[in-house]
């Protein structure tokens, strides 16, 4: 017998026998045989150690495509699902167990864990619509599914039942896109029932953010009293004022008054009633029939009315803080000349946004927020062409990134202080040329009108202003002759000012704010030096005490409170216009420098409100 030849170099296909072949001609009957070993020796290279790898990228898709064709032609199927749902006639679907098990942990357990279905050719399925099961089976073979609004809840429920997580996520994402004031509560309830945590959270967040619109829908009026109380207790409810929550509760009770009037008191205790204005409470006590019919509720609101009008310190109630970014806004300022900048600082990531400029450059202005809108009040335009004191009031809307002019004050006010009580802006002191004002005027946004109120007991420019317990405090300043350490308090019900305990230090151009039921006065100018000292006024003990000093000396600084901490921005240290921003933590009594402004400046207007609409910013910054 001839020895088999040893081959070298590239093999020729004719020299290899196929795995299955017919016997050579003349070798007897033609039968199929298997070649059990390779008869050829191949040495592609000198050492013979080279290897290669090959992957057919779309093999899985092709293989599942073939299996789907087998399913549709009912070939090699090893299970029939008999699906029964309520009164709908049962439907049968033939499939391959291995494919179903590969897409669903429920089917995998059913067909592999020794359950009785493992050996069954016909398996009964209940609790899922046949059309839903048909789509899920098709998804198992094709990795594709098409779902419309009318059936998405059924498909998602079926996907949850059979733990097909990818379909659950797809349905959840679709439903999030469909969220609307009219369906958000229903979607949230559905997600809770099927245990879809992510969809439930997204729907609830939508409800919190759009509470005013949701509260007008039919779904809202179908909430139970417990569900409503839980909803309105949320700190992150997005409302412009607490009266929205109050009216929503009263409307819910009116929807079925005979059955719901018993829940009024419980609901009112969930409303932040101390955030309501005395005028609003007085109107409701006089005109709301539901309150007049419930003596306990009426007494409860009367007590709150008295506490507000008597300016009693109340137990701290968390402010509504919607989960929308809240930024620190800085408007205007001075560096060589007055600036028109509007910028916003995000303490959570340290970023700055450049926004729509003021229509006229201003420094020595004040900033405040009412109903989410930022107001820039007074100031002066210092320019190479001359100096002009301003009586202007401009309103910035973060949703449109636009400024709108409002009614002007009765007189120009440079180096002004402002505070907000009951949604009204109080403009305090300031100067017009060589005139130093003691006058104070109040702006009502609903009417776009200013009205003079009682003047301060002392003329003050560079005055620090803050509001605590519905009282307006004017702190320090300059009267035209002397820098001041005196402070006074305005009682709106009496329309009168009273002196309070003076500060330990003379301060003009200090930053003044309220934190944790105390008034803070930071920095300023004492007639000789810019200051870095900080003192705090306790309204209950009527005493001023020093706290930790700032890192930098500064006067004409901006100041505000964000998430329980004090921020001071810019100012003048006697030599330089500062760009530094410091943050005070009352828990540790420490200051830290957290960022720098885009440029040094003093005399900025500062306030905190919602993050601006990015879409509007991008459109207005577009250069195309």
UniProtKB/Swiss-Prot annotation:
Substrate-specific adapter of a BCR (BTB-CUL3-RBX1) E3 ubiquitin ligase complex that regulates the response to oxidative stress by targeting NFE2L2/NRF2 for ubiquitination. KEAP1 acts as a key sensor of oxidative and electrophilic stress: in normal conditions, the BCR(KEAP1) complex mediates ubiquitination and degradation of NFE2L2/NRF2, a transcription factor regulating expression of many cytoprotective genes. It is found in: Cytoplasm; Nucleus. It comes from Mus musculus. The Kelch repeats mediate interaction with NFE2L2/NRF2, BPTF and PGAM5. Changing residue 530 to A: Impaired interaction with SQSTM1/p62. Disruption phenotype: Early postnatal lethality caused by abnormal cornification. Mice survive until weaning and probably die from malnutrition resulting from hyperkeratosis in the esophagus and forestomach that cause gastric obstruction. Defects are caused by constitutive activation Nfe2l2/Nrf2, leading to constitutive expression of phase 2 detoxifying enzymes. Mice lacking both Nfe2l2/Nrf2 and Keap1 reverse the hyperkeratosis phenotype and are healthy and viable in normal conditions. Belongs to the KEAP1 family. GO terms for molecular function: disordered domain specific binding; identical protein binding; RNA polymerase II-specific DNA-binding transcription factor binding; transcription regulator inhibitor activity; ubiquitin-like ligase-substrate adaptor activity. PANTHER family: KELCH PROTEIN, KELCH-LIKE ECH-ASSOCIATED PROTEIN 1. The keyword Cytoplasm applies. This is Kelch-like ECH-associated protein 1. The modification S-cGMP-cysteine is found at residue 434.
């Amino acid at each position: 017998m001839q020895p088999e030849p040893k081959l070298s170099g590239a093999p020729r296909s004719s020299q290899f026998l196929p795995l299955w072949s017919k016997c050579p001609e003349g070798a007897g009957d033609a039968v199929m045989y298997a070649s059990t070993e390779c008869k050829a020796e191949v040495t592609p290279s000198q050492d013979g150690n080279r290897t290669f790898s090959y992957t057919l990228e779309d093999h899985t898709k092709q293989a599942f495509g073939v299996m789907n064709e087998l399913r549709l032609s009912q070939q090699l199927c090893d299970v029939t699902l008999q699906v029964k749902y309520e009164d709908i006639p049962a439907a049968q679907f033939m499939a391959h167990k291995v494919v179903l098990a590969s897409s669903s942990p429920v089917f995998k357990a059913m067909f592999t864990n020794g359950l009785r279905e493992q050996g069954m050719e016909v398996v009964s399925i209940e609790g899922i619509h046949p059309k839903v099961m048909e789509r899920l089976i098709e998804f198992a073979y094709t990795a594709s599914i098409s779902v419309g609004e009318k059936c998405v809840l059924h498909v998602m429920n079926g996907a949850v039942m059979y733990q097909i997580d990818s379909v659950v996520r797809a349905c959840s994402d679709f439903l999030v896109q469909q969220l609307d004031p009219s369906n958000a509560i229903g979607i949230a309830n559905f997600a809770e029932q099927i245990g879809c945590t992510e969809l439930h959270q997204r729907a609830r967040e939508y409800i919190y953010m759009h509470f005013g619109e949701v509260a007008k829908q039919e779904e809202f009026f179908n909430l139970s009293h417990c569900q409503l109380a839980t909803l309105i207790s949320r700190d992150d409810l997005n409302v412009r004022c607490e009266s929205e929550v109050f009216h929503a509760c009263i409307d819910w009770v009116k929807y079925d008054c005979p059955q719901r009037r018993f829940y009024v008191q419980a609901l009112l205790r969930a409303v932040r009633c101390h955030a309501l204005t005395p005028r609003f409470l007085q109107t409701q006590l006089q005109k709301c029939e539901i309150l007049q019919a419930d003596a306990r509720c009426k007494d409860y609101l009367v007590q709150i009315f008295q506490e507000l009008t008597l300016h009693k310190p109340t137990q701290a109630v968390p402010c509504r803080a919607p989960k929308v970014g809240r930024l620190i806004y800085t408007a205007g300022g001075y560096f060589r000349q007055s600036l028109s900048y509007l910028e916003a600082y995000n303490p959570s990531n340290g970023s700055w946004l450049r926004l729509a400029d003021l229509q006229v450059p201003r420094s020595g202005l004040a900033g405040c927020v009412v109903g989410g809108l930022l107001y820039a009040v007074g100031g002066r335009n210092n320019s190479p062409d001359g100096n002009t004191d301003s009586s202007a009031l401009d309103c910035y809307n973060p949703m449109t990134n636009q400024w709108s002019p409002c009614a002007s004050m009765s007189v120009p006010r440079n180096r002004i202080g402002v505070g907000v009580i009951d949604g009204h802006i109080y403009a305090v002191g300031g100067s017009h040329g060589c005139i130093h004002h003691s006058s104070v005027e109040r702006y009502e946004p609903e009417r776009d009108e200013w009205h003079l109120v009682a003047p301060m007991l002392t003329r003050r420019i560079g005055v620090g202003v803050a509001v605590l317990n519905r009282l307006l405090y004017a702190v320090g300043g300059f009267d035209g002759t002397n820098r001041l350490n005196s402070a006074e308090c305005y009682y709106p019900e009496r329309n009168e000012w009273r002196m309070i305990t003076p500060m330990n230090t003379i301060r003009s151009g200090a930053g003044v704010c309220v934190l944790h039921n105390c008034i803070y006065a930071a920095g300023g100018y004492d007639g000789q030096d810019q200051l870095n000292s900080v003192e705090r006024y306790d309204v209950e003990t009527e005493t001023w005490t020093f706290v930790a000093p700032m890192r930098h000396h500064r006067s004409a600084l901006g100041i505000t409170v964000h998430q329980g901490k004090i921020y001071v921005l810019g100012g003048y240290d006697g030599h330089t216009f500062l760009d530094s921003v410091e943050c005070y933590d009352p828990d540790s009594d420490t200051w830290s420098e957290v960022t720098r402004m885009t440029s040094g400046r003093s005399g900025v207007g500062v306030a905190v409100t919602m993050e601006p609409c990015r879409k509007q910013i991008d459109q207005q910054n577009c250069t195309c």
